[in-house]
């Protein structure tokens, strides 16, 4: 999965997919009542990027729905996975459940069109704080209450705080999550970061009793870093320049080992050689 980083304006969806992304990451900011408000990152952000592009969250969802609905004039067949980077750190811990409920309602209405031919992309809820695990339970309960528990088949999870992997496992246990787990590791492109924790996550993914299904590394701009991440065995790379990742994947060393994921590839299944 080549994951376009910080795609917060509708116009950027086409821009990133046309550069080779089959997945995008979108920032979601919340108001003080835990309503998802804008697709917005803010300053500071990655070096070399504009930090302030944004849309109202529900408006962005409507644009995203068009981009991921076959038959729509804006349909992008290659776009199969969306990571919502939930900026829930602005909330109190006891608001996490509400944030999950409100997020589910927004998606149900504006993206899934209440189960009536909405967007088809798989969705990852990426949460920065382990203490906010109730965001997941709130989200799940709401889809159930609203009569669409089947949409949870399209939803996966990530804790993005680079926490100790054992602690991440405990948070999932509290949230009642078994499966659909993506594990991120990374840092802003302005700073270097080694691959030690990525390798730990990959080892968990590949062990018989691991809880992780997929591992992604962020944010990668350089060919050398891309090669390092691929050599470590990641499933996804988040990038400001998706074409760089696509170029490396076409090199002879990688072309036979990796291919770009399509809609037919289940993002919740651990890849087995």
UniProtKB/Swiss-Prot annotation:
Mg(2+) binds at residues 25, 27, 85. Disulfide bonds join 45-51, 47-190. Keywords: Cytolysis, Dermonecrotic toxin, Disulfide bond, Hemolysis, Lipid degradation, Lipid metabolism, Lyase, Magnesium, Metal-binding, Secreted, Toxin. The active site is at residues 5, 41. The keyword Secreted applies. Its EC number is 4.6.1.-. Binds 1 Mg(2+) ion per subunit. It is found in: Secreted. Expressed by the venom gland. GO terms for cellular component: extracellular region. GO terms for biological process: killing of cells of another organism; lipid catabolic process. The keyword Ribosomal protein does not apply. Its cofactor is Mg(2+). InterPro entries: PLC-like_Pdiesterase_TIM-brl (IPR017946). Belongs to the arthropod phospholipase D family. Class II subfamily. Dermonecrotic toxins cleave the phosphodiester linkage between the phosphate and headgroup of certain phospholipids (sphingolipid and lysolipid substrates), forming an alcohol (often choline) and a cyclic phosphate. This toxin acts on sphingomyelin (SM). It may also act on ceramide phosphoethanolamine (CPE), lysophosphatidylcholine (LPC) and lysophosphatidylethanolamine (LPE), but not on lysophosphatidylserine (LPS), and lysophosphatidylglycerol (LPG). It acts by transphosphatidylation, releasing exclusively cyclic phosphate products as second products. This is Dermonecrotic toxin LdSicTox-alphaIB3aiii. The lineage of its organism: Eukaryota, Metazoa, Ecdysozoa, Arthropoda, Chelicerata.
């Amino acid at each position: 999965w080549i994951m376009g980083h910080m795609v917060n304006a509708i116009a950027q969806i086409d821009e990133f997919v046309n550069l080779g992304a089959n997945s995008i990451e979108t920032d979601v900011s919340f108001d003080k009542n835990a309503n998802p408000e804008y697709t917005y990152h803010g300053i500071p952000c990655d070096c070399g990027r504009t930090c302030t592009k944004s849309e109202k969250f529900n408006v962005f969802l409507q644009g995203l729905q068009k981009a991921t609905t076959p038959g729509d004039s804006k349909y992008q067949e290659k776009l199969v996975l969306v990571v919502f980077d939930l900026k829930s750190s602005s909330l109190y811990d006891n608001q996490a459940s509400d944030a999950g409920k409100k997020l589910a309602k927004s998606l149900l209405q504006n993206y899934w069109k209440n189960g009536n031919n909405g967007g088809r992309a798989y969705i990852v809820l990426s949460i920065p704080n382990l203490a906010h695990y109730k965001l997941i339970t709130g989200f799940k309960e709401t889809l159930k209450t609203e009569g669409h528990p089947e949409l949870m088949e399209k939803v996966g999870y990530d804790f993005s705080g680079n926490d100790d992997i054992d602690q991440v496992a405990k948070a999932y246990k509290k949230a009642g999550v078994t499966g659909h787990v993506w594990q991120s590791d990374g840092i802003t492109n302005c700073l270097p970061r080694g691959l030690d924790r990525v390798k730990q996550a990959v080892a968990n993914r590949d062990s018989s009793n691991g809880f992780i299904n997929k591992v992604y590394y962020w944010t990668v701009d350089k060919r050398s870093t891309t090669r390092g991440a691929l050599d470590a065995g990641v499933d996804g790379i988040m990038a400001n320049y998706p074409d760089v990742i696509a170029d490396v994947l076409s090199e002879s060393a990688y072309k036979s080992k990796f291919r770009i994921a399509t809609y037919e590839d289940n993002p919740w299944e651990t890849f087995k050689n």
